[in-house]
From Swiss-Prot:
Family note: Belongs to the tetrahydrofolate dehydrogenase/cyclohydrolase family.
Identification of the protein by name: Bifunctional protein FolD
Keyword hit for Oxidoreductase: yes
Reaction(s) catalysed (UniProt annotation): (6R)-5,10-methylene-5,6,7,8-tetrahydrofolate + NADP(+) = (6R)-5,10-methenyltetrahydrofolate + NADPH; (6R)-5,10-methenyltetrahydrofolate + H2O = (6R)-10-formyltetrahydrofolate + H(+)
Subunit composition and interactions: Homodimer.
Lineage top rank: taxon: Bacteria
Lineage, highest ranks first: Bacteria, Bacillati, Cyanobacteriota, Cyanophyceae, Synechococcales
Source organism of this protein record: Synechococcus sp. (strain JA-2-3B'a(2-13))
Pathway of action: One-carbon metabolism; tetrahydrofolate interconversion
Enzyme Commission designation: 1.5.1.5, 3.5.4.9
This protein's encoding gene: folD
Amino acid sequence: MPAKILDGKALAARLQAEMAAQVQAWIPQVGRPPGLAVLRVGEDPASAAYVRGKERACERLGIASFGRHFSAQDSPAHLLDTIDQLNQDERVDGILVQLPLPPGWDPIPPLLAINPDKDVDGLHPLNLGRLLRGEPGLRSCTPLGVMRLLQAEGIPIAGRKAVVVGRSILVGKPLSLMLLAADATVTLAHSRTPDLAEVTRAADIVVMAVGRPRLLRADMVKPGAVVIDVGINRIETPTGAEQLVGDVDYEAVKELAAAITPVPGGVGPMTVTMLLANTLQSYKLRSHLCSHY
């Protein structure tokens, strides 16, 4: 029986509609809309497209945008000065530096410069430390989106064997901690893991986040597993057209998995939605609409 398709796009639309209604209810109480600043450096087309998507989502929800664009020839000090100004700007609830930065730009100083309470990407060491300690805080958007999707679909996590393939600070490491906090038994695999197929075949939940097209084949998945594909890869088809694919051989794996996310339309929309959710969480805390995360 083919897998259930985990439709992140549909869930994201429902969550964003709920958030839009909440924003309209909060604005009269607070006296201002929530504010998000997305900072982009350079002319990378993919980054530009991602930023446009985030700004359109903000517009739909009634979130004010305070984004800035810097050229690759600009000074890193200018970016840091801008972050300092946004930290102090009471209209701004969330700050995000769009990654990756151009060659020669160190991403660490700007990530450290963001006020942890406005760190809606969840990448400041304080927020990562809170995650490690199991304390409330702003969480990384893609891992949070994966968890919300699993929970919304009623997929059990506690007591399950989960394998996360990919150890990045953006996805693999924080998602492993979130699954562990949800009482899964977690294995974090990576490019140096010997016999990856043996590891993934033992899993009830497999998350692919390595950026290698169709790495996970059908023979690497046990029947009835849940497969989450975080990968986004552009490949050229035999006709010369460009195609967007994930880290999973989707057509083959969906025939034996219990549930699977497509690419596109799976995890990607949830990432943007969790960015918006983090921005609203910061807005509520800073506006005293709630007292904790």
